[in-house]
């Protein structure tokens, strides 16, 4: 089925955005209040994080409402170029709207890192293949292990982290020795939408690394700009909402989420004897107590009842 035909059933637009920009506390409170009011009026759901270093969020709603929301956010931030990527969803991708004030909009846990002052060099999506194939470059995936497992660029280093907080330790243990032995290597990093790899470049620059680059707009921008025929991307892209993953056309992929452990599960995982809907998957079969599983079973029973009564429910069902 062609993308245009598939899009006919996708009535919700999803916007993933971020901007590293200095914001004072009074402005944060105002922005939070205005965006919450707009989201309520326009039936927009999602999550937005606000901090002194900027804004980071993903929202879902009717297309016109999403456009208005982004325009309002840019006015509130006094910018005209917020980093935003769009994709589509058949159903509402979030359960509620939340706007929160945080210490960081993406948590690396180091106070001295300030992406509003210094970051690496952007690589456009159309130039990323050339960088990947450059023998004098090293490419690093700054996402978590469970994200990398379902999709990646072949040859990229996998730090095998379970959270972004672990990235600095990996740099000290693995990347520093590599660059000390190969000082001419160019460093390139990527992530889902650009925010983690951008902050990672700020950290590397602070640590004295040079020739540091990152994929502008992340994987999502690459999938938007680079055709599947020319793409070096393998698999699907994990996203932090009810869709779980996106295919190369930025439409919902084939993965579901295990609502016991929160990890993505593939169509093959669903067929394994260890999989029980809502209770366990192959990755967490030995991780929970009988008491935990009883709670999971009751939650799944309630979800199933809701789905029976409200078959047109816009929220994705549990897996």
Curated annotation (Swiss-Prot):
Q: Which reaction does it catalyse?
A: uridine(34) in tRNA + AH2 + O2 = 5-hydroxyuridine(34) in tRNA + A + H2O
**Superkingdom of the source species:** Bacteria
Which EC main class describes this enzyme?
Answer: oxidoreductase
Enzyme active site: 191 (cysteine persulfide intermediate)
Its Enzyme Commission number?
Answer: 1.14.-.-
| UniProt KW keywords | Oxidoreductase, tRNA processing
Q: Which InterPro entries match?
A: Rhodanese-like_dom, Rhodanese-like_dom_sf, TrhO, TRHO_N
Residues covered by the Rhodanese domain? 133-231
Any one Gene Ontology MF annotation carried by this entry is:
oxidoreductase activity, acting on paired donors, with incorporation or reduction of molecular oxygen
Q: Which GO terms describe its biological process?
A: tRNA modification
Q: Of which family is this protein a member? A: Belongs to the TrhO family.
State the function annotated in the UniProt record: Catalyzes oxygen-dependent 5-hydroxyuridine (ho5U) modification at position 34 in tRNAs.
Protein's recorded name: tRNA uridine(34) hydroxylase
**Which species does the entry assign this protein to?**
Prochlorococcus marinus (strain NATL2A)
Gene encoding this polypeptide?
trhO
